[in-house]
């Protein structure tokens, strides 16, 4: 597997100058605002449970891991899960569209849930509590403060459109939360992603026309983390946003892994898979988001540095469905136009590392199919591809990846699989830090699917989550969706954990 290790600083500087000219006038901001609602929730353990089942996973095989249990299942009218999950000190929280469930992270036993996503916001009195379009939720564990952070968007017909964010008051996910609701855009927010950096919580999201749901721009916002952790009132919790023009692709924020902070003064990195023909295809753009909470109007988002990627063709020809399934002519959305899952950062002391993935088309004599391409970047201020690889050992389609890296530099990628003979299921592959650059070990099956999605919508989750246990900093947790029987929207989810041999804590 080819590894690109030698992007020089001169090359990066030339790319930065050229690309900055091309992007002139296409970034708007800073746009400074503050929370519109602040309250404290009822304890999550006291919120009513829904009848929505957590299905048993008779199909799940035994793997060389720690945990492989059923997560939450589908709800009528909810076409896909967008499964998000994170481990805390003793618990694992999974979000799917519209509901939460809290598990014992060691046994998989349900502690609380399923709980309606908007019920945690019942004390807010705004659309975060009342809208039945509360979805696109994500969860993360802030390992620096030992608290949970949950978010979703509320998008009732006609607005207002709010980003609903909750920060737990302790490390117990079943307890109370500080509730903050933000109006980051006057239009429809779509597919928000949540990230941790020492100076802020960050959200990146697309902004759509409220009526047509057509893409208008992408947006990235900083939320005042220290104030939210302290539970201060809404008027004193600021937000700082930047947004691109309609011609700029989706922004994706970077989340800190581990306890080692970035070097002093290093700011949030924002990434963008840029496939615009007039800008030159196969670029990965990186920006630097500097927040100034003492004077928010002095905040900046600089860049991009344009990183030329090894040549590829987008999975599914950019945004078109193409993933086949057995027993139906319906094909699934492959999300080839964006980075999928989380983008995560680690400071190893002697170097800094960022990992990410997206879906491409791999063509061989056996034909074409969607495949996972993954990257490890070093020195993110002037990004250098340290290693990259493609996961495509056969003719099965692989897409919707989630990636993370442990404290030893081991990398794992989870993803969906499907083909005309393989039902949509879940697998993962690992790269130990001692393995040859760009190579993944033999993939492991988490769940063998036994059904196809037969709905004509063709949508599939655009998000799955690989995360790291904050206690040992080396146990991986992964959650994604699959089908056990053919139906229009009867998806199920799975939660699994595993370790590399280097993880001995």
Question: What is the predicted function of each stretch?
Answer:
Residues 10-20:
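Bacterial N-terminal signal peptides
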Residues 25-505:
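C-terminal PAP-associated
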Residues 2-11:
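Bacterial N-terminal signal peptides that target proteins for export
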